[in-house]
């Protein structure tokens, strides 16, 4: 069954202590901490915003890189939001912007080369609206070396048109990927698996597509209710 690691869905079968993870939009490094604690894998945390980046705790399993993931290399304006998780390359972030700074941007092929893993076991993307351009600009030969992707698309809050998300997913499907939308509204939590790099059957994929979103939704509600009871 699929598993949620700090609000991002992954398949645990394809992660181990030998795995390499690339975390784009690492913020304060909580996903990196959670994924390495769960699997003992190595994770490269990529974050452009200075304050969250400085707070990411490096370890033998976690390394960090200060950069924005973008379609191409260069210096780009980055919008610092009041809520740090909403900071973005896009000016259309729904959260109030408190500052705009210039940051280094690297493309996915460049980030992939710096990590050096072939294949990459997991790519996590949470880059506040820049994910469509990032994926669409990446050569198929690079994407096809990624075993699974967990991505937060931003059609749920209006930053990205739903049609663009569907178009990007359709292209990934043509490359041999299969996707499961885990969120009720939009593609806030989407899990994507490379069928060519994973021994996963069509029957299992259909089961996960039909059952996993509901089952994991029930678990999320149960956890929230337990927290409320514990706080009462």
Model-derived segments and spans:
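Phosphate/nucleotide-binding beta-alpha loop and adjacent structural elements of enzyme active sites
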Residues: 1-232
